[in-house]
Amino acid sequence: AGVPKDTDPECLRRPKKIGTDSYITAWGPNEYTPIGNLSNYEYRDKLKNIKEPALIINGTNDLCTPLVAKTMYDSIPNSRWELFDDCRHACFVEDTDRYCRLLNEWMEQND
């Protein structure tokens, strides 16, 4: 899960070229398993202070696991959470039609 396949769009397969060293120093390999300088940064208590409507989207093969997404959903007032089956973090690429329908609907309700 989470590893690009040869059949995936090029934007999901290409290696990152910029910011990798800084990112790894700050977070580690990714923001969901932090082992870098920011590993002790606690954000969960701040989520309740978000006043704007929030749309939380993640995929079942995402490093942002359903537990992480549900934690955000449970903590942010006026939020909505959508879980995309068989998608990684780039749901907008892997399930473009559903993503666009969802985003348009949410924007009509909240913009």
Give the role of each language-model region:
Residues 63-68:
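Conserved alpha/beta-hydrolase "acid-adjacent" motif
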Residues 49-50, 56-58:
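Short beta-strand/loop motif that positions the catalytic acidic residue
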Residues 79-111:
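Catalytic active-site module of serine/aspartate enzymes centered on a nucleophile-bearing elbow/loop
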